[in-house]
Amino acid sequence: LGHVVLEGSALDVVTFEVEPDRSMEDAPVGVDRVLDYGARERREVKMDLFAREYLLPRPVLREFHVNEGLTSAMIATRFGAPLAVVQQQLLDALLLPADEQHPVGSGGVAAALTPDPTQMEAAAHRGLAFQLQAGPGTGKTRTLVRRIEGLLADGVDPATILVLTFSNKAANELSERIAASNPLAAAAMWIGTFHAFGLDIVHRFHDQLALPAAPRLIDRTEAIELLEEEFPRLDLKHYRNLWDPALDLSDMLSSISRAKDEVIDAAGYRVLAQSMAARAGTDQDARVRAQKCLEVAMLFEAYERLLTTHQLLDFGDLVALPVRLVEGSAEVRDALRARHEHVLVDEYQDVNRASVRLLKAIVGDGRNLWVVGDARQSIYRFRGASATNIARFAVDFPGAQSAELGINYRSDERIVDVFTEFARGMQASTSTLPLTLKADRGTRGEQVELRVAESPDDEISALAASITALHEQGIAYGGQAVLCASNARLNAIAVGLEARGIPALHLGSLFERPEIKDLLALLSLATDPRAAAMVRVATMARHQMPLQDVMRVIEHLRAANPASLAWSAIHAEVDGLADGSREALARLSPLFAGVNASTNPWTLLAGWTIDGLEIAKTLYRTGDAQSRMKGLAIWQFLNFCRRQPRGQGVPVLRLLDRIRRLALLSEDRGLSQLPRSAENIDAVRLMTIHGSKGLEFEVVHLPGMVTSGLPRNNVPPRCPPPDGLIHGSEGLTGIEAVKAGHDEEEECLFFVALSRARNRLQLYAYARQADGRARSPSRFVAPIERLLAHPAHVPLRAGPTLTGVPLSITWQGRPQWTDIQVNLFERCPRRFLYTHVLK
């Protein structure tokens, strides 16, 4: 039925794989960050979601649960549906925005226009390799889609068309664009990321790689877990944190991953490291760098052995392994060339050498290869991307032709003038076609401004004043975006805007959000016999207890040394508890009824969110901007918890351990990415410049235009690559190559930020740091200074003073602290509380 309604298909469609409780989208972290559905699977996902909505309409479920008070179990019984399906649909109905209209802030202006002659000419190219250099807002995606439509009109079999992108989101959007006019063709062609395509090759030719048909893919946290037992045996000197090897292992795995981006294996890594050692001579610094690289080579060799033994793959293998296979096997090459006659690549500036080598192996002389990109928007150096691949296109594919799109459909002419002026001095511009864009919209908006406040706090006040003024002029909050280079500054801005009553769409660090910490604290009570998380649980409205009573509970458990969950039955046993505290403990117990060592954490959390704590219902009823953000955060958290790596042990403990490790290694950043349905909320978009790539907004605010704000200082990696590893870095040491890439990437980041706005672009800086010292403006301002307006008066919107409430503690006797304990208090008062006060 879904195929008929959504596609108008009269064909009989039969599927044998139905997943009615699937999430609307995968969690953007771990393995799910890379894996994606193929076109056919993507189509079936849509049908599964259609079927669930058809059978369990969200408005009906909201009525039953919110207004009639039915629990998820009651609703499941009434419909005769599986409980997990009902719970997932209720989570979607209560925590995600109900409005499914187009997002306020993003979307493409150029996509709605008739193709211009340069777009039509580029789309019509046939024959040898072709590179289209497409600046911001020039309609590159429309041109790519038009080329695909042209190939289909020429009679090309859609099954022979391969389209490679650099994100699952881009692949999904491209597939949807094509499916809008030709759903069957969209399902037949292969559209996805380089990593997903590499995995497809591994699956097809697994026997030639000595792998099972479906080898398991592991993420960074699983790789560390795999290596932890091997790590102490390696006799390392420079990377030897045996107390907590995760940090060293993560840094070393980053270096190994970077090597795989260059298709360098462990043996090749060792050769480069040995060459460094041979050249070092008496230079002590050079000798140390070589020794560090040799230690990484040692770990690399052990890692490869473990991956082979356990028949596992990591992300870097998904392109590096297929490259070696295709380059070394004429049979595989011929099979892939026959299967993929037409190859199209989006965002070509983001390819690394492994991706280029894979393309060269598949397309041969480059016939029917068509790529589009912009060297000035190359912002993914950490995964090996380089703007030089745009410059080297004719070298990699001899006889290749290049053209450019020359009309910007997105931005006001004054904004176009600013980013084209900056482009003239960019390193990425040295070997590409000049950026000469005509602004199709002409001059309609205001001159680009640089607003200089006195301090970092005043910068937020200036930002708030500007957003408020524009909103009063009729510009929706959702049409305005704040872009920053770092998440830390975004977090401070989000707090500042919300304190001033300005709705902000920003998740930040998911595991640091209060509502997620509450759920994690409750979850830990399921496995911790001493209930240490009771300190936080006792601050929740339904379970409030004074700290003295919490201490009595913890001391009672410490003395009794009970089994897990024994705390849930002691509310009548603990001496000295206030009546309210006994009642709070008693209210906690039902949440853990039936919980055991095999309980699925998602089942537990979903039950609490919907029924046990009625969080979802409360947030839905409140409905303000803050409640919507809390709901989105909880939905994202539960979506993350749905699918976890396989392993031994108690599922709840494994989940908690993985969360700790993800947070420690900053591998949780993908979880700050909002669900697609959140794009409809009318709130100011706060995002990193990386996250804004491919988006556009009516107004863009760009704070932090100060020294070290943008460009940021280069921080050398703890495990720098060996000399000669990075392609195109001849004559540079590994550290110098990383720095050169960093400097170029910072320019590209600023260029991307400047080119996101349609009508208004406002830059912000501050004259003094928080400690009163003067702060110079960013060096990126100078090249565009003549095009900027500098308001003499910068309006500020002051916010309330945010102060914490001190925790009052009564000591039995005078406490004594060591210098180590005092230092811990200065670094982290909360850790001091848990470690030395609540001991």
Which stretches of residues belong to each language-model region?
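Conserved motor-region signature of P-loop NTPase helicases/translocases
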Residues: 104-175, 338, 344-345, 349-538, ...
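Active-site hotspot residues in diverse enzymes, especially metal/ion-binding acidic/histidine motifs
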Residues: 1-107
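Conserved helicase C-terminal RecA-like lobe
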Residues: 269-272, 285-289, 429, 476, ...
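Histidine-centered divalent metal-coordination motifs
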Residues: 1-3, 195, 349, 690
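A basic/glycine-biased coupling hinge at the interface between accessory DNA-binding modules
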Residues: 151-320, 330-333, 338, 367, ...
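C-terminal, charged and often intrinsically disordered regions of DNA end-processing helicases
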Residues: 128, 133, 500, 575, ...
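Short, polar/flexible loop-turn hinges at active-site or ligand-entry regions and domain interfaces
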Residues: 156-160, 181-188, 205-219, 231-245, ...
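Active-site-flanking alpha-helical
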Residues: 2, 6-10, 144, 202, ...
